[in-house]
């Protein structure tokens, strides 16, 4: 016997969260809970404003229609990426095909303060990896901050994310302030320039490895080995079903590229599932999941070690 419930939720964000020039005051999303006999599976559907093609309202409409079809015996996945991802996670939990083992070693987001980062990294076992957002301020300032961090912490490897913010000139201004001796400790820089060709040129000219992120979701993207490209960053909420995520990871690994499972600012429930996906598909790579502290609460499932209050399922709005 099948049953299901869909929950709508909204979590207040910390004041300083800005995505593509818009301030994100709340994180809005949906959960789907599927039950079959004694088994239960959960999934999160939370399109990311400014990044997802679909809105939260569109996702809700598609999700509710899919749930009704599933209750009637139809299991075909929806095409909308955020809904496909959440539904496939719920189905995987329901059939016990999403392993329980999780990788909670999130690469910490750094605000540029070396002392703060040293404290965050002190308890991190193994490789010291952190992430810095660049492209929000002047490129020269970004270069100086990155150089300072690499100089202050000799065993640090940095992941940088520019979100296509730079022109070729700004990319060169950034690189000018990063000591060439430190550049190989930049694990990768995600999408430095507005076009892929400019990003490729940046990698060739600076020796700083790059990673594809937004490019993966463009219709003309193909997985090929390229000079200067070291990694792909896979955001499942923006990608689609678990099967599509797995296909992308396998395609990257076949080329010798690092594949990083990364957050789209999901709630704690979604983040714990991403940690499980990372342990399953990319066991040797630290995922990019250090986004929970951007929110003011956890929901339904706790992230280990987080002190944020937890909103239980009974407090969420039911849609069925």
Curated annotation (Swiss-Prot):
Is Metal-binding among this UniProt entry's keywords? yes
**Annotated InterPro entries:** Enolase-like_C_sf, Enolase-like_N, Enolase_C-like, Mandelate_racemase_C, OSB_synthase_MenC1, OSBS_N
Query: Keyword annotations for this protein?
Result: Lyase, Magnesium, Menaquinone biosynthesis, Metal-binding
GO terms under biological process: menaquinone biosynthetic process
Q: What is its EC number?
A: 4.2.1.113
Give the catalytic activity: (1R,6R)-6-hydroxy-2-succinyl-cyclohexa-2,4-diene-1-carboxylate = 2-succinylbenzoate + H2O
Cofactor(s) required, per the database record: Mg(2+)
Entry-linked Pfam families: MenC_N, MR_MLE_C
Q: What class of enzyme is it?
A: lyase
State the source organism's domain of life.
Bacteria
Query: Under the GO molecular function aspect, what terms does this record hold?
Result: hydro-lyase activity; magnesium ion binding; O-succinylbenzoate synthase activity
User: In which family does this protein belong, per the annotation?
Assistant: Belongs to the mandelate racemase/muconate lactonizing enzyme family. MenC type 1 subfamily.
What role does this protein play?
Converts 2-succinyl-6-hydroxy-2,4-cyclohexadiene-1-carboxylate (SHCHC) to 2-succinylbenzoate (OSB). Does not show detectable N-acylamino acid racemase (NAAAR) activity with N-acetyl-S-methionine as substrate.
Q: What is this protein called?
A: o-succinylbenzoate synthase
Q: What does the organism's lineage look like at the top? A: Bacteria, Pseudomonadati, Pseudomonadota, Gammaproteobacteria, Enterobacterales
């Amino acid at each position: 016997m099948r049953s299901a419930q869909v929950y709508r939720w909204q979590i207040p964000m910390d004041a300083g969260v800005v995505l593509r020039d818009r301030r994100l005051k709340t994180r809005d999303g949906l959960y789907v809970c599927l039950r079959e006999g004694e088994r239960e599976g959960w999934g999160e559907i939370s399109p990311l404003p400014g990044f997802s093609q679909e809105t939260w309202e569109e996702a809700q409409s598609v999700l509710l229609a899919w749930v009704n079809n599933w209750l009637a015996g139809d299991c075909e996945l929806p095409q909308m990426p955020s809904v496909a991802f959440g539904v496939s996670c719920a189905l995987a939990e329901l059939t016990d095909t999403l392993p329980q083992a999780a990788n909670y070693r999130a690469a910490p987001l750094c605000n540029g303060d070396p002392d703060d980062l040293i404290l965050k990294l002190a308890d991190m076992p193994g490789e010291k990896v952190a992430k810095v957002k660049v492209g929000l301020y002047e490129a020269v300032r970004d270069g100086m901050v990155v150089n300072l961090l690499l100089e202050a912490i000799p065993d640090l490897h940095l992941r940088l994310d520019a979100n296509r913010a730079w022109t070729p000139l700004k990319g060169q201004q950034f690189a000018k302030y990063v000591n060439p001796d430190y550049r190989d400790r930049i694990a990768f820089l995600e999408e430095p320039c507005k076009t892929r060709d400019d990003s490729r040129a940046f990698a060739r000219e600076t020796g700083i490895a790059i990673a594809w992120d937004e490019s993966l979701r463009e219709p003309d993207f193909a997985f090929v080995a390229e000079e200067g490209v070291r990694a792909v960053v896979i955001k499942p909420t923006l990608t689609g079903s678990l099967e599509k995520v797995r296909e992308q990871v396998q395609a990257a690994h076949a080329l010798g590229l690092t594949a990083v499972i990364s957050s789209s600012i999901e709630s704690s429930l979604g983040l714990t599932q991403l940690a499980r996906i990372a342990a399953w598909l990319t066991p040797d790579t630290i995922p990019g999941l250090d986004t929970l502290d951007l929110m003011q609460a956890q929901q339904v499932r706790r992230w280990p070690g987080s002190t944020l209050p937890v909103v239980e399922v009974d407090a969420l709005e039911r849609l069925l």
